[in-house]
Amino acid sequence: MPPEKKRKTEPEDKAEVTQQENDVAESTTEPNNQTVTDSKEEPSVTEAALATTSSSSPPVLSASETAQPDTAATSQSSSTPPTSTSAAESAAAKARERAERFRALQARAKSSSQQNLKKATKESQRLQSDPSQLTALGRRHAIASHKLLKADIEDAGGDFERKRAWDWTVEESERWDKRMKKKEAHRDDTAFRDYNQQAEKSYKRQLRNMGGPDLERYTREKLAAIEKAAAAGTLEIVETEDGEMIAIDKDGTFFSTADSTQFAQHKPDKAAVDRLVADMRKAEEASLKKRRERMANNGDDADVTYINEKNKQFNQKLSRFYNKYTAEIRDSFERGTMV
């Protein structure tokens, strides 16, 4: 068991404190006196000591100087945001962008599905309805409304033709009468009379299908030819007193004559060539269709055993004379029992 510690009394404590204070005061005064005397005798030693003291001990800064780094650090910390906050903001922006794109894709898919449904419904309705029946129904409705209007006007004591003429101009009425007259003449002219009349009908039909002359293209080509001839010196452009421009052919090669061959140098455009090809294909299809109909009417829609019309006639002649002898052989070939 260790011995008990001795406790100091209050007077002893006070005496010890005063003794320590006196020792500290003496220690502070003695170095000062010593430094003064030593400075007079050894200035180089004191300078070295001061240099070492200044290099070893940190510099003492004032309150303003110590406050400046703190403010700079505070401003730097406030000016540069934390990396975690910027990363979170960028992630949120990307998430919003992805959500907007997803909503746009959803809206686009919804609109496309609705449009597809509408088009499919219209297509099914079109397939279910017969166009010929719709045309016939519209024609019947127009005839019925015409007859009903005519009966109402006649019952009221009016003139139906005069009443109907109020809705049309004179030019429209004349065009309609001309059209009806032409239609009646065409109806009476449908029967075949001779090949010249048939060729004329085909020629007129082809002219109607051409769609009329291209006057704009003709004007462009004409101006280009005039400019080319004027540049070559074979054509002279003269202006009259009235301001009219006249082209004078110097050597007689610009304007076409009976001996000119400029028409052979014409090159049609691609649209005209395509129209010609389509017209030829249409004529060929019509010819094949009539040929099939003619063969069906003559009973020749079975197996084709000929290569041309002459060979067909020869096969028919053989059939007339030898079918009664070869019928059994042909039937055996068809059954597959022929040895």
From Swiss-Prot:
> Which residues lie in Basic and acidic residues bias regions?
7-16, 94-103
The UniProt entry's GO biological process terms, in alphabetical order, are: mRNA processing; RNA splicing
Question: Which residues lie in Low complexity bias regions?
Answer: 45-93
Give Gene Ontology CC terms. Answer: catalytic step 2 spliceosome; post-mRNA release spliceosomal complex; Prp19 complex
Q: Alphabetically list the UniProt keywords.
A: mRNA processing, mRNA splicing, Nucleus, Spliceosome
Sequence ranges of Polar residues compositional bias: 17-37, 126-135
Q: Positions of the region Disordered?
A: 1-136
Q: Which Pfam families match?
A: SYF2
Cell location = Nucleus
* Superkingdom, taxonomy of origin: Eukaryota
Principal subcellular localisation of the protein: nucleus
For this protein, the record's InterPro entries field holds: mRNA_splic_SYF2 (IPR013260)
The UniProt subunit note reads as follows: Associated with the spliceosome.
Q: Output the PANTHER family linked to this UniProt entry.
A: GCIP-INTERACTING PROTEIN P29, PRE-MRNA-SPLICING FACTOR SYF2
Q: Give the protein's biological function.
A: Involved in pre-mRNA splicing.
Protein family: Belongs to the SYF2 family.
Q: What is this protein called?
A: Pre-mRNA-splicing factor syf2
What organism is the protein native to? Answer: Neurospora crassa (strain ATCC 24698 / 74-OR23-1A / CBS 708.71 / DSM 1257 / FGSC 987)
Identify the gene encoding this protein.
msp-4
